[in-house]
UniProtKB/Swiss-Prot annotation:
Biological role stated in the UniProt entry: Specifically methylates guanosine-37 in various tRNAs.
Identification of the protein by name: tRNA (guanine-N(1)-)-methyltransferase
Gene name as annotated: trmD
InterPro entries named in the record: Alpha/beta_knot_MTases (IPR029028), tRNA_m1G_MeTrfase_C_sf (IPR023148), tRNA_m1G_MeTrfase_TrmD (IPR002649), tRNA_m1G_MTases_N (IPR029026), tRNA_MeTrfase_TRMD/TRM10 (IPR016009)
Domain of life: Bacteria
Organism: Anoxybacillus flavithermus (strain DSM 21510 / WK1)
Main location class: cytoplasm
């Protein structure tokens, strides 16, 4: 996969892209990154990338020209048609399902904005996706791009040490992940559930499925609105409801 990041602050990505999973992914050849400062594409001597909004109002708006030209530049270098992603609070709410969709792409371009917003022509004629990582406002799109990049790259084949790790993560199954424990079995009187020490793989798997569902039911019941429950899962939930009364 090839990932281009269009940003006014490329140095923000230096540490993130050279540590942990993202560093390993590059070493394995699973992904390449290019940081592009779109200020360098501004067609004026002062390299201005923003201007006052038509009609008045507070703040400055990113001009279309530098961003269009920067996207044209990286697209000409590509063998594949890219997904062009705009990070903004108005975008589609980001989910694990979206991460899995993007992980199938060969080339992704992220546009990180600043100031009051983008010229609307960027949205209408350049981008393929608008993504928001939550209902809050950040100073710019860089942090949001880092979140999306990390969640996508870890899904690429061969990136994680355990090929099943990404599939077992919270949200990949539609439910939150079950609790985890490691040694010691008794820490300051806090004990690991007996079933995990039993060696009975069938009971362990049942416990994990049940705890995954319970955690989702308690913490993110909204996820169950679109999740297709089995008959057994429905019985578990009914029992928990009775215990609450």
């Amino acid at each position: 996969m090839k990932i281009d990041v269009l940003t006014l602050f490329p140095n923000m990505f230096t540490g993130v892209l050279n540590e942990s999973i993202l560093k390993r992914a590059q070493e394995k050849g699973a992904v390449t990154f290019q940081l592009v400062n779109f200020r360098e594409f501004a067609d004026n001597k002062h390299q201005t990338v923003d201007d006052y909004p038509y009609g008045g109002g507070a703040g400055m708006v990113l001009k279309p020209q530098p961003i269009f030209d920067a996207v044209d530049h990286v697209t000409k270098q590509s063998e594949h048609r890219p997904r062009v992603i705009l990070l903004c609070p108005q975008g589609e709410r980001y989910t694990q399902k979206k991460a899995e969709e993007l992980a199938k792409e060969r080339h992704i371009i992220f546009i990180c904005g600043h100031y009051e917003g983008y010229d609307e022509r960027i949205r209408e004629h350049l981008v393929t996706d608008e993504i928001s990582i939550g209902d809050y406002v950040l100073t710019g799109g860089e942090l949001a791009a880092m979140v999306v990049i990390d969640s996508v790259v870890r899904l690429l084949p061969g990136v994680l040490g355990n090929e099943h790790s990404s599939m077992l993560d919270s949200y990949s199954s539609g439910l939150l992940e079950h609790p985890h424990y490691t040694r010691p079995a008794d820490f300051r009187g806090m004990k690991v559930p007996d079933v995990l020490l039993s060696g009975n793989h069938r009971l362990i798997e049942e416990w994990r499925q049940k705890e995954s569902l319970r955690r989702t039911w308690l913490r993110r019941p909204d996820l169950l609105e679109t999740y297709e429950l089995t008959e057994q899962q429905k019985k578990w939930i009914e029992q928990w409801k009775k215990n609450e009364r």
